[in-house]
């Protein structure tokens, strides 16, 4: 007995026959053998629809955001679907004509032209009775009634609406700056970015005011090493230099390195740490910062490998939990790179000045004498010294405005940086990092400039000018040793 050919209609009929209200009822007189054969064919039909291409495979890195998986599909012409391609219907042609960029011309037949929608559609639902008002009711008598209602609008209201329409393309912040340019001695460089939503020029002033307040709250104690029993400032520099090397090996973002060192300093400002756990604090801090800043964070096994087996995974994870509890999970640190990018706007994003300034800013990670200064002041001093080295001109009013510091407020920080650069190389990884071609050999250039132009500077601790000295918060260190 030959099996009856199973078609798509039979499959749908057998699967939906009992639940489909529009499907005709089956005849009861159908033979049991025919019923069994149709059920067997249905099972076989289900098996035939399963494709081997649905077996899960290893996902490629960009499968979810690219068309890579379309390359493995079978071409449309090679599929034997037994479907007859008919001509497009009128509704399909009309939909294609609506998607076309080129509008229909007058020479085309009337049947191909798109019908214009009516202004007042009867299918629009009306407002409820308790929400509708007589003075603002929508006219339903056509275009004439619409113009009649418009004529009743007061002239003063029309004038206000016209003024808002004319000035809606210019944000209020920049309109005020354009109206009174004589009241400021700096250029509004944010006005040209108002059309870029990524620059958020409407809120940039408020954002950096908030960051200036936040940087004071997240500053570590500049004297926390006095409470440490087994540690010294030299050990902090060695640990930071090793973290710079690990950071370069993993090719992490610069924000990750700054946040990691800030986590270390804030933790040591609150807890006493032993010498054998200092490296563990550094590894856990870099691990936390990687999770906070990076898109692809290195795994904990990578940090175990970089520690050369000194600590296992459980110790690193336990240190991570303990550090986060001590810091109360507060990782909102205003990164120095944010302030450096802001100042670079007034420098017209000069790549050489910015690269040298990045090298000078990272001195604050290694030299503990720069801890009393907030990140914004360190970045302004780094940009000031970089421009001086490259001969980019004086500290003008644009730089004063976008950095927030006058020239006299940066002299003490510049002296600290020059004092560090005049000494022999103490941190090899830091010096080699900026001696590479990637960073334009900035460390070699700075060292040559220091030898030729700088004069020996002593310890000027008594001449420090810390802009936020009166606002610094107090750190209550506990005697609990970890």
Swiss-Prot record:
A cellular component term, taken from the record's GO annotations: nucleoplasm
Cell division is among the record's keywords = yes
What subcellular compartments does it reside in? Nucleus; Cytoplasm, Cytoskeleton, Microtubule organizing center, Spindle pole body
Where primarily located? Answer: nucleus
Q: Which SUPFAM superfamilies match?
A: Cyclin-like (SSF47954)
Q: Does the keyword Translocase apply?
A: no
Positions of the UniProt region annotated as Disordered:
35-140
* One Gene Ontology term of the molecular function aspect: cyclin-dependent protein serine/threonine kinase regulator activity
Per the database record, which ranges form the Cyclin N-terminal domain? 206-332
Kindly state which keywords UniProt assigns to this record, in alphabetical order.
Cell cycle, Cell division, Cyclin, Cytoplasm, Cytoskeleton, Mitosis, Nucleus
Q: Biological process GO annotation list?
A: cell division; G1/S transition of mitotic cell cycle; meiotic nuclear division; mitotic DNA damage checkpoint signaling; negative regulation of ascospore formation; negative regulation of meiotic cell cycle; positive regulation of G2/M transition of mitotic cell cycle; positive regulation of mitotic sister chromatid biorientation
Record field: compositional bias (Polar residues): 35-55, 78-92, 118-140
The protein's matches in PROSITE patterns, at most eight in alphabetical order, are given as: CYCLINS
- Pfam family for this entry, one: Cyclin_C
Q: Which family does it belong to?
A: Belongs to the cyclin family. Cyclin AB subfamily.
**Job of this protein:** Essential for the control of the cell cycle at the G2/M (mitosis) transition. Interacts with the cdc2 protein kinase to form MPF. G2/M cyclins accumulate steadily during G2 and are abruptly destroyed at mitosis. Involved in the reorganization of the cytoskeleton on transition from G2 to mitosis. Association with rum1 promotes its proteolysis during G1. Also essential for initiation of meiosis II.
Q: Which proteins does it associate with, and in what oligomeric form?
A: Interacts with cdc2. Interacts with rum1. Associates with microtubules. Also interacts with cdc11.
Would you tell me the protein name for this molecule?
Answer: G2/mitotic-specific cyclin cdc13
Question: What's the encoding gene here?
Answer: cdc13
């Amino acid at each position: 007995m030959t099996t009856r050919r199973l078609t798509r209609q039979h499959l749908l009929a057998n699967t939906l026959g009992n639940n489909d209200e529009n499907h005709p009822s089956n005849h009861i007189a159908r033979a049991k053998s025919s019923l069994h054969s149709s059920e067997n064919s249905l099972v076989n039909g289900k098996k035939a629809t399963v494709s081997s291409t649905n077996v899960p495979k290893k996902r490629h890195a960009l499968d979810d955001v690219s068309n890579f998986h379309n390359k493995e599909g079978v071409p449309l012409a090679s599929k034997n679907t037994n479907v007859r391609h008919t001509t497009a219907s009128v509704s399909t042609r009309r939909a294609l004509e609506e998607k076309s960029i080129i509008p229909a011309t007058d020479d085309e037949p009337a049947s191909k032209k798109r019908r214009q929608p009516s202004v007042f559609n009867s299918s629009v639902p009306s407002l409820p009775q308790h929400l509708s008002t007589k003075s603002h009711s929508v006219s339903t008598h056509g275009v004439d009634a619409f113009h009649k209602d418009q004529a009743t609008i007061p002239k003063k209201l029309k004038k206000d609406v016209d003024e808002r329409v004319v000035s809606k393309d210019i944000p209020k912040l920049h309109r005020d700056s354009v109206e009174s340019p004589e009241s400021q001695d700096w250029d509004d460089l944010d006005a040209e970015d108002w059309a870029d939503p990524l620059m958020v020029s409407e809120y940039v002033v408020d954002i950096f005011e908030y960051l200036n307040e936040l940087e004071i709250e997240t500053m570590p104690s500049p004297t926390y090493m006095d409470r440490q029993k087994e540690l010294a400032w030299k050990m902090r520099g060695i640990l930071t230099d090793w973290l710079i090397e690990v950071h370069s090996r993993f090719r992490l973002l610069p924000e990750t390195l700054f946040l990691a060192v800030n986590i270390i300093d804030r933790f040591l400002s609150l807890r006493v740490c032993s010498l054998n756990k200092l490296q563990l604090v550094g590894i856990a801090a870099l691990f936390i910062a990687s999770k906070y800043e990076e898109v692809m964070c290195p795994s904990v096994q990578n940090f175990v490998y970089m520690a050369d087996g000194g600590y296992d995974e459980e110790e690193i994870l336990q240190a991570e939990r303990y550090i986060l509890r001590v810091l109360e999970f507060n990782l909102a640190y205003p990164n120095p790179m944010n302030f450096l990018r802001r100042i670079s706007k007034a420098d017209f994003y000069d790549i050489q000045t910015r690269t040298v300034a990045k090298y000078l800013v990272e001195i604050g990670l290694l030299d503990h004498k720069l801890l009393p200064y907030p990140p914004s002041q360190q970045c302004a001093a780094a940009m000031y010294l970089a421009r001086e080295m490259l001969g980019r001109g004086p500290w003008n009013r644009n730089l004063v405005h976008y950095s927030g510091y006058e020239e006299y407020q940066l002299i003490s920080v510049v002296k600290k940086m020059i004092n560090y650069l005049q000494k022999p190389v103490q941190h090899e990884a830091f010096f080699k990092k900026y001696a590479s071609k990637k960073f334009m050999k900035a460390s070699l250039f700075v060292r040559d400039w220091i030898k030729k132009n700088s004069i020996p500077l002593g310890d000027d601790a008594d001449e420090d000018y810390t802009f936020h000295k009166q606002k610094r918060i107090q750190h209550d260190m506990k005697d609990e040793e970890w």
